[in-house]
Amino acid sequence: MTKSELIESLAGKYPHLSPRDIEHAIKEMIGCMSEALAGGERIEIRGFGSFSLHHRPPRVGRNPKTGESVHLPSRRVPHFKPGKELRDRVNSIKD
């Protein structure tokens, strides 16, 4: 699902809200979450999951074009851990 599909879906469920208002709310929510993660905070949304930062240690990579070894510095990367309710809901889907 893309952001525009999410906006369409929410606009269908909440006809009293304009798609523009929904888009602004989604952008604001994503902005707040991004700022919190950039500040090192953990975000927990009960029933959905949590976002946190994980440390990735430095390593030696390889340039795929030249085959040359390249030193990659350590970095923090966003990590999502799904909550129990989300895991259960996804696992209940029949293939």
UniProtKB/Swiss-Prot annotation:
Keywords on record: DNA recombination, DNA-binding, Transcription, Transcription regulation, Translation regulation
CDD domains to which the protein is assigned, alphabetical: IHF_B
Region (Disordered): 52-95
Entry's Gene Ontology molecular function annotations: DNA binding; structural constituent of chromatin
Classification via Gene3D superfamilies: IHF-like DNA-binding proteins
Entry's Gene Ontology BP terms: DNA recombination; regulation of DNA-templated transcription; regulation of translation
Pfam families attached to this UniProt entry: Bac_DNA_binding
Name the UniProt record assigns to this protein: Integration host factor subunit beta
Species annotation: Methylococcus capsulatus (strain ATCC 33009 / NCIMB 11132 / Bath)
High-level lineage: Bacteria, Pseudomonadati, Pseudomonadota, Gammaproteobacteria, Methylococcales
Gene designation: ihfB
